[in-house]
Amino acid sequence: MQTLSQHRWYHRVLLLVVITALIVIVSWRLASTQGLSSRLEDAYGYLANSSSRTNASTDTLIGSLQERLRTNPQDWQSFSQLGLAYLQKARETGDPTYYQKTEEALDKALALQSDDYVSMSARGALALARHDFSAALEWGEKARQINPDRTYAYGVIADAQIELGRYEEAVETLQTMVDLRPDMSSYSRISYIRELHGDVDGALEMMQVAVDSGTPNAESTAWVRTQLANLYFNRGDLDQAELEYRLTLQNHPDYVYALAGLGRVRAAQGERQEAIQYLNQAVTIMPMPEFVIALGDLYQAAGDQESADQQYQLVTAIETLYRANGVDMDMEIALFNADHDRNLEETVALARKAYANRPSIHGADALAWALFNIGDYEEAQQYSAEALKLGTKDSLKLFHAGMIAFELGDKAEARAYLEEALAINPYFSILYAEEAQRTLEILK
């Protein structure tokens, strides 16, 4: 199972970024008519903060926009709004088939209005969701050139820069973003960049600011609070993590990210059956790959290999669906295969391809672990060192580094990495936490 690190969750749907990345507040070019102005305001209020969620659903918004377009097929603003609504629907359901609908709506908007800032930015967000980070960066830069004073594009640009390993540039982008508009979207991204650089306290502080800046009942606030809970989990603070997950569920009883988080808390506490119940609930609502993998790992840990294999087969089916809708799953599947001893030689090739497309610390870690699993420990160590270059307090990456050092016979380094991994979070992985402890005992 992957660690509950902020990145892995932020990134599995940086498996995503549209399924899981924040839909930021976007400023529209308002038309002179009051009717159009009202329509744009309504759409942005809904899509940005979900503050109108108590009065309307995404389906209602989509239906309304489709009806407008039937009577006025040249209405580029409605096409742009519809594209954003489809992105939100993908976020709510985890259904990647909405990506093609998003692309079609946004491309129609751009065909009618080639310099539409919002549609360009949203095209970038769609590219992020599909893990085409170079394209996302290109779309974001195009949008920024049109209007450098609006913030939506900066979020797209920063997310792409992070996934492309351009961390210094991402810091500069986010500083500009927060200077222009200090809000939930910029705060949460700054939290993430702090986490990547090993400043966990600073990440927690900024994520709390992001939570406090949100509308209490908004889905976006639920998402950010769940990220706050994940940060607490990643440092081994199960009580605070559970508190934040439960606060999320008070306003959103079926919020899958919080349900899955509680499942991991229960797993860490040794309550496997309750953990399975929570993750089963999450998978039933939204079969996201990370939920399905975690559930399979729990079944495996409980000795129910048949149920585990059923979940792992589902991962393969989900991969097929994602790829059919333009989502690059190379890195995620490489990690999954390496963790579960599947097609190891092919997995190395997949991990190399993933790293070439997204040369981030996460891509380096995936390649290191794939190489480890075929016994190429020296090359694995090179990429593992790269994965740790920012000082990220990620127990799984440290575990990988420790096991690589162990196989290379460097006992002191192996012990140091494994001790640090367990000191940060002794519950970091269902698959590997106990193995880390056993290996430390051998080293002692």
Task: Label the model's feature ranges.
Residues 2-118, 138, 426-427, 433-444:
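N-terminal leader/linker segments that initiate helical-solenoid repeat arrays
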Residues 73, 114, 148, 181-182, ...:
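Short coil turns that delineate tetratricopeptide repeat
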Residues 77, 84, 118, 152, ...:
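Start-of-helix register in tetratricopeptide repeats
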Residues 81, 122, 156, 189, ...:
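Canonical tetratricopeptide repeat
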Residues 84, 91, 125, 159, ...:
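Residue-level recognition of tetratricopeptide repeat
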